[in-house]
Amino acid sequence: MPFIVNTDADRESMLHATGVSSFDELIVDIPREVRLNKALELAPAADEMEVRSILESMAAANRSTADYVSFLGGGAYDHFLPSAIKAIVSRSEFYTAYTPYQAEVSQGTLQAIYEYQSLICRLYGMDVTNASMYDGATALAEAVLMAIGVNGRQKVVVAGKLHPWNSSVLKTYLEASDHSAVVQNVVEDGVGSIEVLKGLMDDTVAAVVVQQPNFYGCLEDVEAIGRLAHEHGALFIVSANPVSLGVLEAPGAYGADISVGEGQPLGSSQSFGGPYLGIFSVRQELVRKLPGRLVGMTKDSNGQDGFILTLQTREQHIRREKATSNICSNQALNALQAAVYLSLLGKQGLSEVAGQSLSRAHYLAGRIAAIPGFSIRYNAPFFNEFVVDTPIPPSEVVRKMLEKKVFAGCDLGEFGDEGLLVAVTEKRTKAQLDMFADALGELA
Amino acid sequence: MNVPAALRYTKDHEWIQLLDDGATALVGITDFAQSELGDIVFVELKPAGTALKEHEIFGTVEAVKTVADLFAPVAGEILEVNAGLDSAETVNQDPYGSGWMVKMKLADPASVANLLDAAAYRELIGG
C-alpha cells in the first residue's frame, strides 16, 4: 500500500501542467550551490507492517514511569491521571479542533477553554487567565515582556532560584529587546536573600520574578519579595506549580500582578518533555496588555449563553506587526486536560493530591537524612521536592538506581549545579519510598 | 454623515478643533471613522507631556474586530487626555463632543489651515 502515489507518469503530468519540461527547470530559481546536489540517503522502502515493527521496537527501548518508580521532578511531575481525562480529550471534536475562530461551530471548544480559564483564575487567585501558552518557560518570558511594556522600565530582577531552563528561555526572549538586563538574586540556603534583593531594587526595575516552589523545591519568602517589588513600583511576577496551590497560598492572595506556571502537573503526562501547558493570569487592570487570547461568555441575540474569542485584536491575525506576543496558537488540548483534571478532583481532591505529595516527600526526606553519608542540603521549608547531597556522584546514584527500575531524581550536575533533586508525588506508595531509601542505603 | 463645518480633518479620519486661545486644539476621530470601526471597546492614548510630530501615532482605538492607529493632525504636545474615555463607547455616541481624545498645544497653529475643510473631507468619504 503506497503512501506517496507519485509515479514517473504522475510527475510527468504535473510538469506538463506547470508548463516546464523537467524538475530542474521547475526549480531553476534556486541557485545550484544551495541545492542538495546528491541523492537523499534514505533507508530502503518498507511496508506498513515492517515500519510498525521498527517503530515499536524503538519505542520499547524507552523506559517510562509506567515501568519505573519515578522520583523525577524539576518542572515535570508524575502525578496520577484519572482515566476519564484521556477518554474526554480523545474525543475527535476536541482532538482535531484548531483555533476556534468561528464561534458558531466551536461552542464546545470555546466553552472548554472558558472553563479552563475560570478554574485557573480560582486556583491562582487572579482575575483573568488567557487561553494558555506553549509552556511554563515561555509564559514566564512573556510575563516579563508584558511587565516591561506596562511600565516602560528596563531591568528585571529574579528573586531566588529560578529553573535554569526558564532563565535560559527568559534570556533568549530578552536578547531581542534592546536594553533589558536580568539580575539574578544571590541564593542562600536554597532561597533568595531578601537583604541582597533590597540592594538590587530601585525605580528602574520593571519586574521582580520569583518561582514558588523554587528550582530546589524550597519555598521562597514570596510575601516579602512582593512587598519589595511594589514599594519600588515594579510588577510582581510569580511562577507557581499549580498542584502546590492545593496547600500553598494562591499568588493573587500575596499580591502577584502576573501569575504564570507550568501546567503539566494538572492532568498532562510527562511525555518525555512535552507538549506542555503555559498558564498565564493577570489582575484585571492588566487585561489590555495580556498576550494571547481570551474566551469570554456572552448572550446571543436570543438571550442564550454563548462563548466567543475576545480581546483578540492584539494577536497576530489582526495586527501582526503590533501583536503584544508572538504566541498565537495556544495549548488547547493540554488546557482541556487541566480543566478536566481540576473538575474531576475538585478543591478537596486537589488539596489531597498536594497534601499527600507534601507529606510523602517529607517522609522520604526524613528517611534519606537518616542514611549515613546522605543529607538534605537545605533547611528551608519545601513542598514535594528537595536536594540531596550524596556520598557518591549523583550521576552514579542515578545509574545504579536504574538497575532497580527506579528513576532516582535529577542530577543537578546537568544544570552546572550539585546534588540530586528528588521529587515525590501522591503516586509513591510507602513501600516504594522505603524501597528507595533502603536501596540508597546500600550505596553509602 | 455628520461633518461639522467648523472643524478641520485629516485623510486618516481625525478631526481637530482650534480652541479660542488660538494655541491649543482638541483632537478626535470623525463620525465616519467611528461608524466604520463599529463598537469601540478601548481607547489607548499616549500620556500628557508627549511631544508629537505631524502624523505621529498618539494612540490606538480598538473595536471588537480591529484596532486602528491614531495620527496627530499637526505637530504639538499632548496637554491632556480625555479621562472620560474609560467608557470607550462615548466615541461612538458623541465623536465630536464628549468623545474627544486629546487636547494639544500646537507647535504652529497656522498649520491647521493646511488640513482638509469639511467640504474636502466630505468629498473624501464620498458623502
From Swiss-Prot, chain A:
Disulfide connectivity? none
An MF annotation (GO) of this entry: glycine dehydrogenase (decarboxylating) activity
Keyword hit for Nucleotidyltransferase? no
Q: Which reaction does it catalyse?
A: N(6)-[(R)-lipoyl]-L-lysyl-[glycine-cleavage complex H protein] + glycine + H(+) = N(6)-[(R)-S(8)-aminomethyldihydrolipoyl]-L-lysyl-[glycine-cleavage complex H protein] + CO2
- What is any one GO biological process for this UniProt entry? glycine decarboxylation via glycine cleavage system
Q: What is its EC number?
A: 1.4.4.2
Chloroplast listed as a keyword: no
Task: Name the SUPFAM superfamilies on file.
Answer: PLP-dependent transferases (SSF53383)
Q: Which residues cross the membrane?
A: none
Q: Which Pfam families match?
A: GDC-P
Function of the molecule: The glycine cleavage system catalyzes the degradation of glycine. The P protein binds the alpha-amino group of glycine through its pyridoxal phosphate cofactor; CO(2) is released and the remaining methylamine moiety is then transferred to the lipoamide cofactor of the H protein.
Database matches in NCBIfam families? PRK00451.1
Q: What PANTHER family does this protein map onto?
A: GLYCINE CLEAVAGE SYSTEM P-PROTEIN, GLYCINE DEHYDROGENASE (DECARBOXYLATING)
Note the HAMAP family from the entry.
Answer: GcvPA (MF_00712)
Q: Which family does it belong to?
A: Belongs to the GcvP family. N-terminal subunit subfamily.
Quaternary structure note: The glycine cleavage system is composed of four proteins: P, T, L and H. In this organism, the P 'protein' is a heterodimer of two subunits.
Give the protein's recorded name: Probable glycine dehydrogenase (decarboxylating) subunit 1
From Swiss-Prot, chain B:
Task: Enumerate the UniProt keywords alphabetically.
Answer: Lipoyl
The cofactor named in the record is: (R)-lipoate
GO cellular component terms attached to this protein's record:
cytoplasm; glycine cleavage complex
The record's remark on the cofactor is:
Binds 1 lipoyl cofactor covalently.
Gene Ontology biological-process entries: glycine decarboxylation via glycine cleavage system
> Organism's domain of life?
Bacteria
Q: Which residues form the Lipoyl-binding domain?
A: 24-105
Q: Which PROSITE patterns match?
A: BIOTINYL_LIPOYL (PS50968), LIPOYL (PS00189)
Q: Which residues carry this modification: N6-lipoyllysine?
A: 65
Q: Name one Pfam family in it.
A: GCV_H
Q: Does the keyword rRNA processing apply?
A: no
The family database entries (PANTHER family) matched by this protein are listed as: GLYCINE CLEAVAGE SYSTEM H PROTEIN, GLYCINE CLEAVAGE SYSTEM H PROTEIN-RELATED
Q: Could you give the subunit structure recorded for this chain?
A: The glycine cleavage system is composed of four proteins: P, T, L and H.
Cited HAMAP family: GcvH
The record's comment on protein family reads: Belongs to the GcvH family.
* Function description: The glycine cleavage system catalyzes the degradation of glycine. The H protein shuttles the methylamine group of glycine from the P protein to the T protein.
Name of the protein described by the UniProt record: Glycine cleavage system H protein
Species this chain originates from: Chlorobium luteolum (strain DSM 273 / BCRC 81028 / 2530) (Pelodictyon luteolum)
Task: Give me the gene this protein comes from.
Answer: gcvH
